[in-house]
């Protein structure tokens, strides 16, 4: 082979691209990784400084059933620790704070409780109909894909409190608005993360743990192992498949050649690349139609854990339109040092507040923390970190790309479909924990096996492989109560009461008529 010639070119040095390259090397192949940034990690980004020791400004959370990322972390000796949830969480709504335990805030209004319960139960039930590997094949795919989550919430929610929390549920999980996302896509997204409880929970859920020392250790470990196969500051500008080898050009005028290419970047970033021949129509239209979510990740550091002294763990669920933050988690180091609270500015709020100065965002965040926690100590941080992922040229947003109405059924089937000698990875193409680091690993390794299958090195039946459960982070089932399984919806309850009232009235009228001899055989 000539210089800059490889078996496979992997475009994207995030977790997905690096895990793809790692598997190729482990299988005896010679890949190269081209990363546009001056660092590896993609949408994971760990910063080290004296104030924070280390801080994850990007993807950070892992939990039970995320077995692939846990396997790779273990290979590099990266330990996990549990996000603190020993004390009470806080639900802030209508200007008041309500401590609670568990993944979801309790509802004391019986109608609101029925509405909340029916919301989660209905989403999980609908998700059961959706195949993880092909959501467009769901029995009601066309109907659900034409509907936004806002329309679905309007259809199944009776109370304002349920609709309000449902909006936050979408904001938190996919950093977009209910009116922006397809119901089919969002229901699939929740389903492939294990359901409403698994995706939203800290304990036993997707946010249970973090990596001690930061999530970027995973990418850095793979990059060290790959050595000079990883090329930084190599933004790809063109891919030419017309020759015997695929030719990839970078903006710094380097040329790389290989038999196959794996694109391990968000679908929308394909628009930065010129393709020869042009992409097929559906693929070309898909990459124009899947925007990225919007989020600013914010860490506020304090002298001490004053919230724990008040009996709070640091998790806040904040339902107030003027509040910048929607959800927080404790971000204190596992040894108890560097007390901090992590908060997300989500979706519409991240776009609205992006024009503020950094100091103004910090001030507003500290003010809402002071109100929610009932402590003026929140007003006096010792340090602040933030990352607006919407300004990242080579991400375009975070956490993941989302599908607006109508896109999944028309274009979803080409998301992973190879184009000639081009194969597609990236967390968006995963079928388990898409949008998370776990999905990035699944997608990268699957794309590598697709390439090896094309090379004749393995059978097609070996492309998709399940992962053994992590023994270090076992998953526990979520147990529902009798009432959670059988409590009627508000609509069902009112219908039952209406029928019951009618029957009671009819019975009373019948008794009166019978007593007066107006009915025969009485």
UniProtKB/Swiss-Prot annotation:
It catalyses: a secondary aliphatic amine + O2 + H2O = a primary amine + an aldehyde + H2O2; a primary methyl amine + O2 + H2O = an aldehyde + H2O2 + NH4(+); serotonin + O2 + H2O = (5-hydroxyindol-3-yl)acetaldehyde + H2O2 + NH4(+); 2-phenylethylamine + O2 + H2O = 2-phenylacetaldehyde + H2O2 + NH4(+). Its cofactor is FAD. One of its GO terms (cellular component) is mitochondrial outer membrane. The keyword Transmembrane helix applies. Its main location: mitochondrion. InterPro entries: Amino_oxidase, FAD/NAD-bd_sf, Flavin_amine_oxidase, Flavin_MAO. Strongest expression in brain and intestine, followed by liver, heart and gill. Little expression in spleen, eye or muscle. In brain, highest activity in noradrenergic and serotonergic cell groups and those of the habenulointerpeduncular pathway; moderate levels in dopaminergic cell clusters. Residues 1-492 are cytoplasmic. Its EC number is 1.4.3.21, 1.4.3.4. It is a single-pass type IV membrane protein. The keyword Mitochondrion applies. There appears to be only one form of this enzyme in zebrafish, whereas in mammals two forms (MAOA and MAOB) exist. This is Amine oxidase [flavin-containing].
């Amino acid at each position: 082979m000539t210089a800059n010639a490889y078996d496979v070119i992997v475009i994207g040095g995030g977790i997905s691209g690096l895990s793809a390259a790692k598997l190729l090397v482990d299988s005896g192949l010679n890949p190269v990784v081209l990363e546009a940034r001056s660092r590896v990690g993609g949408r994971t980004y760990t910063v080290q400084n004296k104030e924070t020791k280390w801080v994850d400004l990007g993807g950070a959370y892992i939990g039970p059933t995320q077995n692939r990322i846990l396997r790779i972390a273990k290979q590099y000796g990266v330990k996990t620790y549990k996000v603190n949830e020993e004390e009470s969480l806080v639900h802030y709504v209508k200007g008041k704070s309500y401590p609670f335990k568990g993944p979801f805030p309790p509802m004391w209004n019986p109608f609101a409780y029925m509405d909340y319960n029916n919301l989660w139960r209905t989403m999980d039930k609908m998700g059961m109909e959706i195949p993880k590997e092909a959501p467009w094949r769901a029995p009601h795919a066309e109907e659900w894909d034409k509907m936004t989550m806002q329309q679905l919430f309007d259809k199944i929610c009776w109370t304002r409190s349920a609709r309000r929390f449902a909006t936050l549920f979408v904001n938190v999980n996919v950093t977009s608005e209910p009116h922006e996302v397809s119901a089919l896509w969002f229901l699939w997204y929740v389903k492939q993360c294990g359901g409403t409880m698994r995706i939203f929970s800290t304990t036993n859920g997707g946010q249970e743990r973090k990596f001690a020392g930061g999530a970027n250790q995973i990418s850095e470990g793979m990059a060290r192992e790959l050595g000079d196969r990883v090329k930084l500051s190599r933004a790809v500008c063109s891919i030419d498949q017309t020759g015997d080898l695929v030719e990839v050009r970078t903006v710094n005028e380097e040329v790389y050649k290989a038999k196959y290419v794996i694109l391990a970047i968000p679908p929308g970033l394909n628009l930065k690349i010129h393709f020869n021949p042009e992409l097929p129509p559906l693929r070309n239209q898909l990459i124009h139609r899947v925007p990225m979510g919007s989020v600013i990740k914010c860490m506020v550091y304090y002298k001490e854990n004053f919230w724990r002294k008040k009996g709070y763990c640091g998790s806040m669920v904040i339902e107030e339109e003027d509040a910048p933050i929607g959800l927080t988690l404790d971000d204190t180091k596992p040894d108890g040092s560097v007390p901090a609270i992590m908060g997300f500015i989500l979706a519409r709020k991240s776009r609205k507040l992006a024009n503020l100065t950094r100091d103004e965002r910090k001030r507003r965040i500290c003010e809402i923390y002071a109100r929610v926690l009932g402590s003026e100590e929140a007003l006096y941080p010792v340090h602040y970190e933030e990352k607006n992922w919407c300004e990242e040229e080579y991400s375009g947003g975070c956490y993941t790309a989302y599908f607006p109405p109508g896109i999944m059924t028309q274009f979803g089937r080409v998301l992973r479909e190879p184009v000639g000698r081009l194969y597609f990875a990236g967390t968006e193409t995963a079928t388990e924990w898409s949008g998370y680091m776990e999905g990035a690993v699944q997608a990268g390794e699957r794309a590598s096996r697709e390439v090896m299958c094309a090379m004749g090195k393995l059978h097609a039946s070996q492309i998709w492989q399940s992962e053994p459960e992590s023994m270090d982070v076992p998953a526990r089932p979520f147990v529902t109560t009798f009432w959670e399984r059988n409590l009627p919806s508000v609509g069902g309850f009112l219908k039952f009461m209406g029928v019951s009232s009618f029957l009671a009235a009819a019975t009373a009228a019948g008794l009166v008529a019978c007593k007066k001899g107006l009915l025969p055989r009485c």
